[in-house]
Amino acid sequence: MSTGRTHRQTYRPNQDFLTPPVSLTVSPSAPASGSAVTLTATLTNTAPVGLLGTVLYLAVNGTGRPSALGRLAPGRAATRTWRTRLADDAEGEVSFTAHALFDVGPGSSDCTRVSSSVLLPYRSLPGAFDNAGIASDDALTVADIDGSASSLSAQALAAAGLTPGAAVTYNGVTFTWPDTRPGNLDNVICSGQTVLLSGSGSRLAFLGTSTWGAGKGDGKVVYADGSEQAFSVGVPDWYGANASASVVLPYRHIATGRDDNPVSLYTFGVDLDSGKELRSLVLPKVSDGLQSGVATLHVFAMTVA
């Protein structure tokens, strides 16, 4: 950085003062899609010289507005508030950011920032998809279902009737297989996400599988009247032709190519209070994302029956 004088201050490169703290609060702390939110950020100049030409940006998912603060003297703080509205179709992770840009002398610009995020309910199961677990036999590297570059074969699935968007019935329950191409997101890793539901029925059923051992965890169904129903799942590992499987595929992909050992998909679920309208589902928290060697539960489809 260069040195110079601005507003009678001298910038010295050996002074470590280019990270003034900025704080950010979001209200309400757990907003809903389509609701109003207020972002409040405070930039405090802890440097021994003034911050020049200071601009403070407040943003939601990277989109926001700047506020010009001008010169911020040493020891002074400036607060700006922005009231905005989340999109009606907002879902999943929503990030909030406060980002300050400033100069401390000619040619000596710097910045500081802080971020936070909230996880909104997903509007549908496909909206929650965060893993690509299906690959074509001629393009194995586009998917990874277990953190070790393994995947289900699109061709083996098609031979079993599981083509994109297909309606398939197991144990009297009909599911819609993900309408996605190999390599695209096609399943959700169960990590405690919330998915909105509607309607009513006697059973909430899932079609999925587990990698690196049995996928075990606790979930929750929330009804429209505010009542809750806890449930537990224990889904066997995908490797092998399991007697309890709804679908058995003759082979899978691994990092080095085709592996001619069978893998299994399963149906599982929870019995519901059929007289109640559904509001949402909290998926079982089995893992924190995809990790090789860690039991992970994947859901490809669900239905209220």
Question: What is each stretch, according to the model?
Answer:
Residues 11-32:
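Low-complexity, acidic Ser/Thr/Pro/Gly-rich terminal tails and inter-domain linkers that flank the onset
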